[in-house]
Amino acid sequence: MKRIVSLLMVIAITLPLMAQSHFVPVIAVPDCPEKAHIAEMIKMAGCYPEMVDTTDDIDATEWDGAVTPDGWVKHGEEYSIHFYRAIAERNIPHIGTSKAARQIDLEMKQLPYEEIAFEELVRKAMTFKRAKNLMDGMLTIDTHCDLPEGYAKGYSVGKKTESQCSVQKMEEGHLDAQVLISFLWQGPTDDASSQKAVEKNLRQIEEIIEDVGKYPDLCGLAKTPEEAEALRNQGRKAFFIGVENGYGIGKDLGNIKKMRDLGVVYITLCHFRDNSICNTSSRHGSDPSKGLTEYGRQVVEEMNRQGIMIDLSHPSAGTFWDCIKYSKAPVICSHSGAKAVYGHDRGLDDRQLKALAENGGVIQVYSVPEYLGRSRSSMTIDDMMAHFNHCVEVAGAEHVGIGSDFDGGGGVWGCNGDNDLINLTVKMLEHGYTPTQIRGFWGGNFMRVMKEVQSIASRD
């Protein structure tokens, strides 16, 4: 009995010291009449209560969970607004009674305050803590973000605006790197129109370089996995550049080298319409069974030679199989899904998923509602995970990652911006994926392919 009492005393003494440790979840308790009682319940659950008495405490603290007894907060409206905003922006698991709380976390059971059961909050807080620890110990990347399309609206990597992507939101979501996209709508393929597309693409790439260059203390451009890792070690975010639509190559293969010199790491061969390189998977194309043109084969060969990844996210099935056949290097799908889960033309069927794995490539799963299921408005993070889990089951854990397509149509309940990406890690843990697999999902797999593609180019 004395030993048990002594052990309890040790736990009581050391628990506050462990609050910022690797293992003990920290749960925020707002300044309310019942906070002492709440704190005792949290301690009994094996967590550490963080008393939040001022708005400074709210802004300065990183929690793993929070209690939100609506209407009980002492400090008034401003304090409450800050408290709820911190929870919403940082995706903190919580339990509460307000309408706002239900909107923030639709899965949480809403009970009258005196009947609140803390077990679910504690479980979520512990999983959230594990997710943070994992993501903070690896290089994490989202491989498709269309933020540059919003430059005219004032979007910028260094500003927290209405965009789904920014350095600030990356920090909240524990994301280290992102691929920013120079996107081109498909136009006529005559020589003059193609040259205009080339010029527009190069101009957009320069705009990305300029935007990232505005914030040297926050981020930098990366052309290789090693450069991204170096930026992470410096405490800065890494941005790669991708091009969506080979229309930007024009009719001159020399433009591929120009793009590589500027830092482009992958090119999506086409978009929603056929072009001079290949046919599209979209219904707007002429025939999805058709693949690479003769010029398209030359493009694939030159991309291999320059060390630029071939992205098959929009091309037709015929193009997919042609690239599997003709490319000397692994290929990628930077933002795609599983056709077996929902039969949209943007998804890959199981035969393609298996071939992608045999090729050594990777599929990065998107968050675009209309590609995930029939009801756009009701799609959630669970629908995204259904595609993700199927891809893992068919292709293997070494060949799957995340390519959200944020600011380009991506975003569902629970995963609607860089700040929400940690929620995917929580879902991965709940599904039972191992830390090693999760490291692969969040960057290891994609970076492996990038290294191999660049290595093959250097050997040639």
Report each predicted region and the residues it spans.
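Positively charged n-region of N-terminal signal peptides that target proteins for export
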Residues: 1-4
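Bacterial N-terminal signal peptides
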Residues: 7-16
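Boundary at the C-terminal end of the N-terminal hydrophobic targeting segment
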Residues: 17-21
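Conserved phosphotransfer microenvironments
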Residues: 35, 68-85
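A short, well-structured beta->alpha microelement
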Residues: 43-58, 116, 221-229
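Short acidic/histidine-rich motifs immediately flanking catalytic phosphotransfer sites
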Residues: 59-70
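N-terminal hydrophobic targeting/anchoring segments and the immediately downstream early-domain regions
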Residues: 122-286, 343-402, 406-460
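Active-site core of metal-dependent hydrolases
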Residues: 269-279, 284-353, 364-369
